[in-house]
From Swiss-Prot:
Role of this protein: Catalyzes the reversible conversion of 2-phosphoglycerate (2-PG) into phosphoenolpyruvate (PEP). It is essential for the degradation of carbohydrates via glycolysis.
Protein name as it appears in the record: Enolase 1
Pathway as given in its UniProt record: Carbohydrate degradation; glycolysis; pyruvate from D-glyceraldehyde 3-phosphate: step 4/5
Alphabetic keyword roster: Cytoplasm, Glycolysis, Lyase, Magnesium, Metal-binding, Secreted
Major site of localization recorded for this protein: cytoplasm
Binding site for Mg(2+): 241, 285, 312
Catalytic site positions: 204, 337
Binding site for (2R)-2-phosphoglycerate: 162, 337, 366-367, 388
Disulphide-bonded residues: none
Co-factor requirement: Mg(2+)
């Protein structure tokens, strides 16, 4: 199938920062659109997001260069050209870029084209996007890990750790799981309000109160779960993403928003061990900094048989980095973010490697999101069993949940909700 036309424009993401939108048309008249997300806390090894750097325009965050790369170099190379499948297009774009991190054309330009082509091919063949991405066996509906309290780089408050999530797993379906999550979210709001704390929300829709400690965030959530009529651990568990790379300073971890305390790698592992023993935690993402490989190995050895340990900044959805982690026995799950690697094909290849080595895949949005629901289809396509797409509010987050409800409805009786078994080692 030939690509007849491809073009891009600059649009805005959920934080009001520019991002890339790509529109693509196939020769049979199929038209598709894709919008590229952007992260706040990014891994050092992520593919390059091309920004203009013109401080007079959007504070240097414009993406006109990336847009121009789609409209000129990429369009010239792929228009009126036949691509048999996704892999053929994506590797053509990788070769066109000529760098190992997509810094010439920009991962935001390349990914926009890659996603738009995937959506167009699915539409053209009258196949749901989740089946185009994962095949006819795509049927597992995920547990939504909802980011109900924000800290770190995602909020201007006193909490060091970036994301405190709830996982409503004791449900018969995704739709009911979302209902449980929303009820806890609203109950938590009432708890915070009663204590005179802020109910303003952060970038991902979670509350961003000023609390006395990171532990207090967990205590508040447990109170919200109970207030909503559910039992912690039995019905709803907790997932964490402290984004520890943001705390890494000269070989130590600095609690830069609360106590200003510096702790060693070993002390950080002990902290997580005590939290896992004390609270109903089923998943810990980026519990250690991306460059603290020794700490990661220690963490995996200590609690890797108790909970799911996810590498985000550590792996950056990169196949070769993941392989290094597998060989070192580090983590037992990988976070999947399309824009960390920059093409649909490379994302799927990383997922395949993870599954072959018994690692879980945890699909994720970015803090700078759009209303594109591609990751909802990806999650079902690869039968990931869990995803994080923000909190119980903000349209760009809810759109992923709405798409998942549509998919569940479409799958009918073949849809199967993952439940607690979505999480590695969960009991």
């Amino acid at each position: 199938m030939k690509i007849q036309n491809v073009n891009a424009i600059e649009i805005l993401d959920s934080r009001g920062n520019p991002t890339v939108e790509v529109n693509l048309k196939l020769e049979d008249g199929t038209i598709s659109r894709a919008m590229v997300p952007s992260g706040a806390s990014t891994g050092e090894r992520e593919a390059t997001e091309l920004r203009d750097g013109d401080k007079k325009r959007y504070g240097g965050k414009g993406v006109l260069k990336a847009v121009e790369n789609v409209n000129s170099a990429i369009a010239k190379a792929i228009e009126n050209k036949h691509f048999t499948n996704q892999r053929e297009l994506d590797y053509f774009l990788i070769e066109l870029d000529e760098t190992n991190n997509k810094s010439k054309l920009g991962a935001n330009a390349i990914l926009g084209v890659s996603m738009a082509f995937a959506r167009a091919k699915a539409q053209s063949s009258r196949t749901p996007l989740y089946q185009y991405l994962g095949g006819s066996n795509a049927h597992i509906m995920p547990v939504p890990c909802m980011n109900v309290i924000n800290g770190g780089k995602h909020a201007d408050n006193t909490i060091d750790f970036q994301e405190f999530m709830i996982a409503p797993h004791n449900a018969p379906s995704f739709r009911e799981s979302i209902r449980m999550g929303e009820e806890v979210f609203h109950a938590l709001k009432a708890v915070l309000k009663l204590k005179g704390l802020s109910t303003g929300v952060g970038d991902e829709g979670g509350f961003a109160p000023d609390l006395k400690s990171n532990e207090q965030a967990v205590e508040m959530i447990l109170e919200g779960i109970t207030k909503a009529g559910y039992k912690p651990s039995v019905d709803v568990s907790i997932c964490l993403d402290p984004a520890s790379s943001e705390m890494w300073e000269n070989g130590k971890y600095k609690f830069f928003k609360s106590t200003q305390k510096l702790v060693s790698s070993d002390e950080m592992v002990k902290l997580w061990e005590s939290w896992v023993n004390q609270y109903p935690i089923v998943l810990l993402e980026d519990g250690m900094a991306e460059n603290d490989w020794e700490g990661w190995k220690n963490l995996t050895d200590v609690i890797g048989n108790k909970i799911e340990i996810v590498g985000d900044d550590l792996f950056c959805t990169n196949k070769s980095i993941l392989l290094n982690g597998i060989n070192k026995g580090v983590a037992n799950s990988i976070l999947i973010k399309l824009n960390q690697i920059g093409t649909v094909t490379e994302t799927l290849e990383t997922i395949e490697l993870a599954y072959k080595n018994s690692y879980n895949c945890f699909v994720s949005h970015r803090s700078g999101e759009t209303v594109d629901s591609f990751i909802a289809d990806l999650t079902v396509g690869i039968n990931a069993g869990h995803l994080k797409s923000g909190s119980g509010c903000r349209g760009e987050r809810i759109e992923k949940f709405n798409q998942l409800m549509r998919i569940e409805n479409e799958l009918g009786k073949s849809a199967q909700f993952a439940g607690l078994k979505a999480f590695k080692n969960a009991k």
